[in-house]
């Protein structure tokens, strides 16, 4: 039986610009907002959009990501007619090949896609923070009788040169694609979200592989090929909150924006929930010296210091006399007695020893996964 649309989430990126935070995990597995990992947003969008089959394409350091996703039950994707499949590079008869790019990762998983038998494939990045109804985008794709639909976001002209820019006609048909142009003609930036008619994309990828034509990347190769071939390629304009958290500064900024109950992501909207793996933790403990304001504090935290405009993830500790300001403290991290943290991201399981000061006033500071700063005590 043919399924209407299969979602494929590209989640194999290393995220080198996140430095210490991705030395041992893939970027989509990095924590966000105290309770989530970045990939939760794409997975939740799929679940809320009524997509029942999702493939997650992994490559770099996939263990934490695989454990987090599990069988997809946290997103309601573990039913008889639904599921999440983890797609990793594998050795085939022609030899072992790593994914060489975004579209090459899709080509390497043709057998899986054919088995699902979709009419359309939705290609997503697993490293953006946003809410989006993919069903609306699919309807636009159908209405335009498009071969390819690209989700675009209007960006300030001064920032347009950082993105792949789509130049369109009056009907939103894409007539030209420019990758990070020095002099952009448009402000419609690609979000890295695509809907393809599967058979057309399949035929193009197979033909390119047989002829040894480089077709490894959607932005650099596939979209230009579609335009040159005269395929009907349309833009789908998205106007909601969308954040690329590929740098330390942007990740910190997105977390700080998320703190507000009236944040642009509309995180408290119960009609479009963001789901995540639900780990059971004990209740929070606020000690006699605890002072917490304008902050998000998740289950299992121990606080006996001062926390202002910050996020404490599951099981984080802020001990007596410690001060945390404008910072993100990830799961299991410990801020020792008298330590002072300002404008920083403290990675999972990290230990900031007693009296240590970390000041990110000039540049957001980062402490890596399980990193120890200062001299740890037996209590840590």
Curated annotation (Swiss-Prot):
<keyword id="KW-0321">Glycogen metabolism</keyword>
<feature type="binding site">
    <location>
        <position position="164"/>
    </location>
    <ligand>
        <name>alpha-D-glucose 1-phosphate</name>
    </ligand>
</feature>
<comment type="function">
    <text>Involved in the biosynthesis of ADP-glucose, a building block required for the elongation reactions to produce glycogen. Catalyzes the reaction between ATP and alpha-D-glucose 1-phosphate (G1P) to produce pyrophosphate and ADP-Glc.</text>
</comment>
<feature type="binding site">
    <location>
        <position position="190"/>
    </location>
    <ligand>
        <name>alpha-D-glucose 1-phosphate</name>
    </ligand>
</feature>
<keyword id="KW-0320">Glycogen biosynthesis</keyword>
<comment type="pathway">
    <text>Glycan biosynthesis; glycogen biosynthesis.</text>
</comment>
<dbReference type="Pfam" id="PF00483">
    <property type="entry name" value="NTP_transferase"/>
</dbReference>
<keyword id="KW-0119">Carbohydrate metabolism</keyword>
<keyword id="KW-0548">Nucleotidyltransferase</keyword>
<keyword id="KW-0067">ATP-binding</keyword>
<comment type="similarity">
    <text>Belongs to the bacterial/plant glucose-1-phosphate adenylyltransferase family.</text>
</comment>
<dbReference type="GO" id="GO:0005524">
    <property type="term" value="F:ATP binding"/>
</dbReference>
<dbReference type="InterPro" id="IPR005836">
    <property type="entry name" value="ADP_Glu_pyroP_CS"/>
</dbReference>
<feature type="binding site">
    <location>
        <begin position="179"/>
        <end position="180"/>
    </location>
    <ligand>
        <name>alpha-D-glucose 1-phosphate</name>
    </ligand>
</feature>
<keyword id="KW-0808">Transferase</keyword>
<keyword id="KW-0547">Nucleotide-binding</keyword>
<dbReference type="InterPro" id="IPR056818">
    <property type="entry name" value="GlmU/GlgC-like_hexapep"/>
</dbReference>
<dbReference type="InterPro" id="IPR011831">
    <property type="entry name" value="ADP-Glc_PPase"/>
</dbReference>
<dbReference type="InterPro" id="IPR023049">
    <property type="entry name" value="GlgC_bac"/>
</dbReference>
<protein>
    <recommendedName>
        <fullName>Glucose-1-phosphate adenylyltransferase</fullName>
        <ecNumber>2.7.7.27</ecNumber>
    </recommendedName>
</protein>
<dbReference type="GO" id="GO:0008878">
    <property type="term" value="F:glucose-1-phosphate adenylyltransferase activity"/>
</dbReference>
<dbReference type="Pfam" id="PF24894">
    <property type="entry name" value="Hexapep_GlmU"/>
</dbReference>
<dbReference type="InterPro" id="IPR029044">
    <property type="entry name" value="Nucleotide-diphossugar_trans"/>
</dbReference>
<dbReference type="InterPro" id="IPR011004">
    <property type="entry name" value="Trimer_LpxA-like_sf"/>
</dbReference>
<dbReference type="InterPro" id="IPR005835">
    <property type="entry name" value="NTP_transferase_dom"/>
</dbReference>
<dbReference type="GO" id="GO:0005978">
    <property type="term" value="P:glycogen biosynthetic process"/>
</dbReference>
<comment type="subunit">
    <text>Homotetramer.</text>
</comment>
């Amino acid at each position: 039986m043919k399924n209407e649309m299969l979602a494929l989430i590209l989640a194999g990126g290393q995220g080198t610009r996140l430095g210490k935070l991705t030395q041992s995990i893939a970027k989509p597995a990095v924590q966000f907002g105290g309770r989530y990992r970045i990939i939760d947003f794409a997975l939740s969008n799929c679940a809320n959009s009524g997509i029942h089959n999702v493939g997650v394409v992994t490559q770099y350091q996939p263990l934490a990501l695989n454990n987090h996703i599990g069988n997809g039950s946290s997103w309601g994707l573990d039913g008889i007619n639904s599921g999440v499949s983890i797609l990793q590079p594998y050795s085939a008869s022609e030899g072992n090949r790593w994914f060489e790019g975004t579209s090459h990762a899709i080509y390497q998983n043709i057998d899986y896609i054919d088995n699902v038998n979709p009419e359309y494939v939705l290609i997503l990045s697993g490293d953006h923070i946003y809410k989006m109804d993919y069903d609306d985008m699919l309807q636009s794709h159908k209405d335009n009788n498009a071969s390819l639909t690209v989700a675009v976001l209007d960006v300030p002209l001064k920032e347009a040169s950082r993105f792949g820019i789509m130049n369109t006609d009056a009907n939103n048909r894409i007539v030209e694609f420019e990758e990070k142009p020095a002099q952009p003609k448009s402000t419609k930036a690609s979000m890295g979200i695509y809907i393809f008619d599967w058979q057309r994309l399949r035929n193009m990828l197979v033909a390119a592989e047989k002829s040894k034509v480089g077709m490894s990347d959607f932005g650099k190769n596939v979209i230009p090929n579609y335009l040159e071939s005269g395929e009907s390629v349309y833009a789908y304009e998205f106007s909601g909150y969308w954040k690329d958290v590929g740098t330390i500064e942007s990740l910190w900024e997105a977390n700080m924006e998320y703190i507000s109950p009236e944040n642009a992501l509309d995180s408290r909207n119960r009609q479009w929930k963001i789901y995540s793996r639900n780990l059971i933790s004990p209740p929070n403990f606020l000690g006699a010296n605890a002072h917490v304001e304008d902050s998000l504090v998740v289950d299992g935290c121990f606080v006996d210091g001062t926390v202002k405009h910050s996020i404490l993830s599951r099981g984080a500790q802020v001990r007596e006399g410690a001060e945390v300001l404008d910072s993100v403290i990830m799961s299991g991290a410990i801020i020792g007695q008298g330590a002072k943290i300002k404008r920083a991201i403290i990675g999972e399981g990290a230990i900031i020893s007693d009296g240590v000061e970390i000041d990110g006033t000039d540049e957001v500071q980062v402490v890596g996964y399980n990193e120890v700063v200062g001299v740890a005590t037996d209590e840590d």
